């Protein structure tokens, strides 16, 4: 892929989960910083500034996790453009350790839109020219493994979740400090809420976690696909519903939906889980 570095940093202790690994929400936070860097390379250096008239809105994000990142791990990210149409683009971000090993790979679909109304409009000729220069391929090992990226027609709703018997795994309200400059819940905030719900998912299958289970059973995300259908704003109440969508003794797929302002996510987990069935979406 194009070796355009768009982010460099390290892992702080407070960003790690109970297993000592960088929490998935902070992977996404890094990817959003990297998106700002790539936006600058496309000629949109101020895309996320308060006064911006045009911005990039994440519509979909696929993440493949390949190697854990622990406290003080030095990391960097490169980025490029996989495809661009009239108003959208599919971008690729590769997060690497200092030794060059791939830590995670992101495919992010963004919409070129007005910052306040989120109305899509065509890319500029300058951005298209830069996109051609930044054309990239998915790095080896970063390809999707178990989650298809075909178009998805969501059925996510509170009624659908009730019909499937999905567990209540999160409730809350969007706070102003969790929103971006344009008043929308930040992308990493969606992932952080999904991550926070996972202990409740395991509790449903008899593994409540906590101090008593420390060191016994753990889980690690292998893949995510998140599709954003609407963006909650400050004051909006959220409800998260989750369930197992399939798997075996070692792997499971957790399907979650944030109701009211629906989001859809598939998460493939490594761990000891009991698979059940849930279906919130159908491929087209």
Predicted feature descriptions by range:
Residues 61-64, 223-227:
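Short alpha-helix capping/helix-loop boundary micro-motifs
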